[in-house]
């Protein structure tokens, strides 16, 4: 599984070469960001049997066009970026978000800021 932000440095961090080095019949899961995985290379790897399948909550091109290989392969599951929509969102994430909004309204950086280095640019 992938758990990283998308940057220009890691775009297509999983491409044909990386997939070729994976164990045969592995399953790739991406819930992070579209663009981390080369969707064309992934579709080809699943179609060829190199990978058993994939679970994608994000893809490079959203929305995918009808008939796209990621949508037509039965061994690939694509969800509309709702993989994080679990039952605890109301109990954990919403209060965290509310606290960050109050912090920002007071003129401070949110506690959970992940890109602080870019805020002063």
Explain the meaning of each model-derived region.
Residues 1-69:
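Rossmann-like adenosine-cofactor binding region
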Residues 60-121:
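C-terminal helix-to-coil terminal segments
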């Amino acid at each position: 599984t992938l758990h990283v932000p998308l940057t220009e440095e890691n775009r297509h961090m999983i491409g044909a070469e990386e997939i070729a080095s994976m164990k045969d019949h592995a399953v790739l899961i991406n819930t992070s960001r579209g663009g981390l995985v080369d969707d064309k290379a992934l579709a080809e790897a699943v179609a060829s049997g190199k990978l058993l399948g994939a679970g994608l909550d994000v893809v490079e091109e959203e929305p995918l066009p009808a008939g796209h290989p990621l949508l037509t392969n039965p061994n690939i599951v694509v969800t509309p970026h709702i993989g994080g929509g679990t039952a605890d969102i109301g109990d954990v994430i919403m209060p965290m978000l509310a606290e960050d909004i109050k912090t920002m309204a007071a003129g401070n950086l949110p506690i959970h800021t992940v890109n602080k280095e870019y805020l002063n640019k």
